[in-house]
């Protein structure tokens, strides 16, 4: 059912909301290749409750992330970028299948996304001037 991937775990078919899980409703929807109308995946049909749970999970994780030194945050983001680059082919295939676009464009989108993660990884250590944390509301 899934596109030919070297790492099938790149398409987990669940939401990452603190942990990998199904939509609260239990509903799913099929993802098909618009070029062939072939179903290649099934994913959670997430709703407002899932969005709220994601916001709550992010809010709960914030104090821990906030305490991580900038150099360590940069290393985490760099590692994420390295993983994106390492799996560019599989991620490009997923984008190509989901959107019905040429594989070269899917690969290009992954490279473009990677450039943003790389930029933020580098910016994490470039805090110039005074850094005043915003209050969490």
Task: Give the location of each predicted region.
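Glycine-rich loop-to-alpha-helix module at the N-terminal edge of alpha/beta enzyme cores
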Residues: 40-127
């Amino acid at each position: 059912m899934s596109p030919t991937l070297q790492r099938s775990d790149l398409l987990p078919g669940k939401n990452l909301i603190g942990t990998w899980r199904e939509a609260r409703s239990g509903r799913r929807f099929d993802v098909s290749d618009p070029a062939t109308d072939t179903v290649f995946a099934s994913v959670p049909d997430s709703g407002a409750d899932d969005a709220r749970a994601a916001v709550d999970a992010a809010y709960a994780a914030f104090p821990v992330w906030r305490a991580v030194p900038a150099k360590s945050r940069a290393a985490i983001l760099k590692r994420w970028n390295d993983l994106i680059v390492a799996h560019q082919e599989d991620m490009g295939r997923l984008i190509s299948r989901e959107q019905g676009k040429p594989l070269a464009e899917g690969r290009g989108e992954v490279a473009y996304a990677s450039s943003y993660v790389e930029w933020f990884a580098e910016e994490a250590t470039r805090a110039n001037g005074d850094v005043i944390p915003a209050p969490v509301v």
